[in-house]
Amino acid sequence: IGKPARNVKRADALDYLAGYTVCNDYAIRDYLENYYRPNLRVKNRDATTPVGPWMVDVADVPDPSQLKLRTWINGELKQEGSTADMIFDIPYLIEYFSSFMTLQPGDMIATGTPEGLADVVPGDEVVVEVEGVGRLVNRIVSESEFFAARGKRKTRGKQHDQALDQRPGSR
C-alpha cells in the first residue's frame, strides 16, 4: 500500500498501491488443529513468510490481473497459474479490507496461491515467481536449525529440540 486507504472504491483501488513483490506465505500444517480455529500457530511462525527480493513500482506492472504465477520445489514445477484465476482480485481485496480498517503505507496484502499445494521438508529449495515482478528463492530449514543459526536456542530444552529433529522430514 502506498498511501492511507479507508473505504476505497474498487474502481480507485489500484491508485492506493505502491507496488508488487513476491511473497511465499508458508503454512506449518503440523499445527493445523481444526478448520474453524484461528490458525495463528499455522501461519505466524518465525521466518515462514519470505518476501522479495524487491518491490516493483506499480507503474511498471501495467496489468496485474494477467500475471503468470509459478512455484518450483527442487527444480520441479509444482504450481502454475495466473492472477486472472484469483478468487478475489487486488481491487476487490483493497476495497474489502479498507471497508473495516485503514490500510497504511507499507502494508502488504498476500493474495493466495494457485492450485497445487505441496509439502516441503528441510533441505528443499523453493522458487516462487510472479511474471514481471520477480523470483523469490529460499531453502527450507528445520526450526531447530533456524534458531541454532541465529544463536537463539529455544528455551523449551533439549527434549523439545530432539522431538523437533525426529519429526518426519526434519533432517
Name these PLM-found stretches.
Residues 6-20:
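N-terminal accessory regions of nucleic-acid-interacting proteins
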Residues 29-171:
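Catalytic-pocket segment enriched in acidic/His residues
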